[in-house]
């Protein structure tokens, strides 16, 4: 994960070069950055294969990174998809379903990281994700 200095990390850390070499040698399948800025996310995708971005009902500033990924065949991992457990909506609206509908509707989304320590919540989230992903409406 980046500390927020995404561009500086990508331009000065030297980490992407050995990762690119490992990919070329077939030792890894791909590489990317878990960033915090649009500029860093775009640069990560230009130089690598994927980016991990925050995208949820409350935070959508990194949407341009998803748009770029969709148009360039790059992968996106969504972090904080459920707003760190704080996704809240009006009464009667399921915040988990609404969150999944948002993130999986974007063609740039490859996967979402959904964390929980509660097995019941995990099962419920999987069921909702499955319903959203198989929905025809």
Regions found by a protein language model. Name each.
Residues 1-57, 64, 74:
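Glycine/proline-rich, positively charged
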Residues 21, 42, 47, 63-137:
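Structured C-terminal cap/extension of enzyme domains
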């Amino acid at each position: 994960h980046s500390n927020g200095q995404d561009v500086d990390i990508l331009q000065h850390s030297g980490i992407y070069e050995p990762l690119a070499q490992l990919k070329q040698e077939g030792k890894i399948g791909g590489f990317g950055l878990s960033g915090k800025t649009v500029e860093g996310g775009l640069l990560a995708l230009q130089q690598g294969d994927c980016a991990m971005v925050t995208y949820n009902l409350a935070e959508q500033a990194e949407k341009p990174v998803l748009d770029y990924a969709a148009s360039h065949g790059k992968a996106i991992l969504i972090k904080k998809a459920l707003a760190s457990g704080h996704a809240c909506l009006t009464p009667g609206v399921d915040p988990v379903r609404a969150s999944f509908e948002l993130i999986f509707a974007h063609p740039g989304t490859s996967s979402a990281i959904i964390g929980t320590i509660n097995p019941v919540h995990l099962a419920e989230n999987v069921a909702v994700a499955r319903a959203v992903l198989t929905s025809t409406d």
